[in-house]
Amino acid sequence: MTTDFKSTPPGVMVGQVIRDLVLPMNLRAIPVLSGDRLIGLVAIGDLRKVEQERWGDTPVDQVMTPVSDLSTVSPDDPLATALERFGATELPLLPVIKDGRLVGLLYRESVIGYVRMQEMLGVEGRR
């Protein structure tokens, strides 16, 4: 899990998110936060639905996937739970929620890499 991540507030325009986060940082999905509470996630697929002429007047909260439609995990969930939830989504990450707050992001490729490393080393672990 990474705790150092970029996010955006809900009222920011799509164009600003693309200009400031997506392109320079190669981010494929960005949490949308109200304070420290996750309200949604805006992914490349969401942004692509907005015509470029509308980037300057379309806020991300109009195109994001709301938190109620997202798969999430808690910091205490076992690795098997994360793997199961990744199987149910095409998103590259799972938000990690504790007490209603976003505390980190779990990236699919990191989890897969961890599992592969365990297999290569013959190590069994719960997380």
Give the residues covered by each predicted segment.
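Short beta-to-alpha loop/turn elements within the nucleotide-binding domains of ABC transporters
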Residues: 12, 42, 58, 77, ...
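Flexible internal linker/loop segments at domain or repeat junctions
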Residues: 49, 57-58
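Bateman (tandem CBS) regulatory domains
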Residues: 1-5, 12-16, 58-70, 126
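Methionine-biased hydrophobic packing positions in alpha-helices, especially
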Residues: 1, 21, 64-66, 86, ...
